[in-house]
């Protein structure tokens, strides 16, 4: 059963949307609407964009050849990149929380089977 997600309550949904727009739709207008987690959203989005090459290298070093980032769906790529950014640069956030939040947010964009695959990665 899919859980309804409200982007107003899930900063990671907004992060995924902003990054997807920037990486794949040439959306360079990175304005951030008023939100109680605006600073966090802005930090993760801008940090992920700024450190994109470092994140790609980290993923390349930890995934097998058949699971390279470029072989994954674009939404998967965005979710993985932003989660990796948080793992590397937001050490105060527990890893379990980051994983859970991104898996929950992925339900907004992916089918159940795809979410399970994302969890396996």
Regions found by a protein language model. Name each.
Residues 1-108, 113-114, 119-121:
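N-terminal interaction/assembly modules
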């Amino acid at each position: 059963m899919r859980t309804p997600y409200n982007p107003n309550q899930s900063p990671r949904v907004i992060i995924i949307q902003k990054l997807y727009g920037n990486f794949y739709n040439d959306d360079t207008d990175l304005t951030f609407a008023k939100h109680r987690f605006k600073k966090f959203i802005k930090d993760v989005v801008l940090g992920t964009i700024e450190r994109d090459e470092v994140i790609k290298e980290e993923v390349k070093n930890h995934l097998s050849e058949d699971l390279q980032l470029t072989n994954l769906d674009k939404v998967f790529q965005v979710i993985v990149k932003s989660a990796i950014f948080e793992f590397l640069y937001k050490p105060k956030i527990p890893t379990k929380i980051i994983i859970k939040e991104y898996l929950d947010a992925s339900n907004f964009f992916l089918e159940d089977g795809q979410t399970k695959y994302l969890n396996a990665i």
